[in-house]
Curated annotation (Swiss-Prot):
Keyword tRNA processing attached: no
Domain called MADS-box: residue spans: 1-61
Tissues in which the protein is found: Expressed in pollen.
Subunit field text: Forms a heterodimer with AGL30.
Protein name per its UniProtKB record: Agamous-like MADS-box protein AGL66
């Protein structure tokens, strides 16, 4: 019995459909290979399996080249090249339109690929970049040549002039480096001096110390003139009293104590009167002071005359007092 002829229609079973494709694919590829060898033709075979796996075959020419030849054909040639097993069957118009759109897309992609691979289609930006790279390479070579001057190779020198020139360049460079170093050191010292001066000025509270004096005197305060208290006045005038008493004792020829005691009583009365006056109204002696041009100025200052006896008048008074008291003492 012969083989049963398989009806040409779609196989419904998925497994059977995949098995049938695998068997007939190998036979189709074998026939295409034999045809390309025997007839020396360009052939391209493109297949997708039921599981969407791609299968390709091409002869001695790449499949891309075969498709390019097909894309470059005219529409009339493409239409005449369509071959159908059943001659009574006509091509579907919608399938033809879809195929044409696909072919036009492939042709556009092919044109882009040819334009990119064409040496004459180099972009101007690429030329500018190449020119910039060339310039940078030249600058790099020049910089390397300049650096070689600071690390000379004695083997390359052949004359004394070259040695002297190299020595002069190195000495000039060393001089510039030292000058730059001194400049930086001077700038650092100046900045440190300014910082210390500013810190000292801030610690003093002002350039002339006015803040220190201003701390003593409260502006418009009631006690701004009380620089010294009553005890300080008493101590000061007690010292003056002692000094006056000692000077009067030196001027006294007889050296008796009653004369010095008499003078002491006079000064004590005067000191007590002064202390009582300053205790009641101390501001009369030291009125409010003002600052003018960094100095302390008292606008109400007046000259005060202190009643101090001259030495000659004081001596005459003491002698007369002595003459009066001597008869009294002798009578006692």
């Amino acid at each position: 019995m012969g083989r049963v002829k398989l009806e040409i229609k779609r196989i419904e079973n998925t497994t059977n459909r995949q098995v049938t494709f695998s068997k007939r694919r190998n036979g189709l590829i074998k026939k295409a290979y034999e045809l390309s060898i025997l007839c020396d033709i360009d052939i391209a075979l493109l297949m997708f399996s039921p599981s969407d796996r791609l299968s390709l075959f091409s002869g001695k020419t790449r499949i891309e080249d075969v498709f390019s030849r097909y894309i470059n054909l005219s529409d009339q040639e493409r239409e005449n090249a369509l071959v159908f097993p059943d001659q009574s069957r006509r091509p579907d118009f919608q399938s033809k339109e879809y195929l044409l759109r696909t072919l036009q897309q492939l042709k556009a992609e092919n044109d882009i690929a040819l334009q990119l691979t064409n040496p004459t289609a180099i972009n101007s930006d690429v030329e500018e970049l190449e020119h910039e790279v060339y310039k940078l390479q030249q600058q790099l070579l020049m910089a390397e040549e300049e650096l070689r001057k600071y690390e000379p190779d004695p083997i390359r020198f052949t004359t004394m002039e070259e040695y002297e020139t190299c020595e002069k360049q190195l000495m000039d460079t060393l001089t510039r480096v030292n000058q730059r170093r001194e400049h930086i050191l001077s700038q650092d010292q100046l900045s440190s001096y300014e910082a210390s001066a500013l810190q000292q000025q801030q610690s003093m509270g002002g350039p002339f110390g006015n803040d220190v004096v201003g701390g003593w005197l409260t502006e418009n305060g009631p006690n701004e003139a009380h620089l010294f208290d009553a005890s300080a006045h008493s101590a000061m005038y007690e010292t003056l009293l002692q000094g006056s008493s000692s000077s009067s004792n030196q001027n006294n020829i007889m050296g008796e104590s009653n004369v010095s005691n008499h003078n002491g009583d006079m000064f004590q009365e005067w000191a007590q009167a002064y202390n009582s006056t300053t205790a009641h109204n101390p501001s009369t002696l030291f009125p409010p002071m003002q600052h003018q041009h960094g100095l302390v100025v008292d606008p109400n200052i007046e000259e005060i005359e202190i009643p101090v006896m001259k030495k000659d008048a004081q001596a005459d008074h003491e002698v007369s007092d002595y003459d009066i008291r001597m008869p009294q003492l002798s009578s006692q």
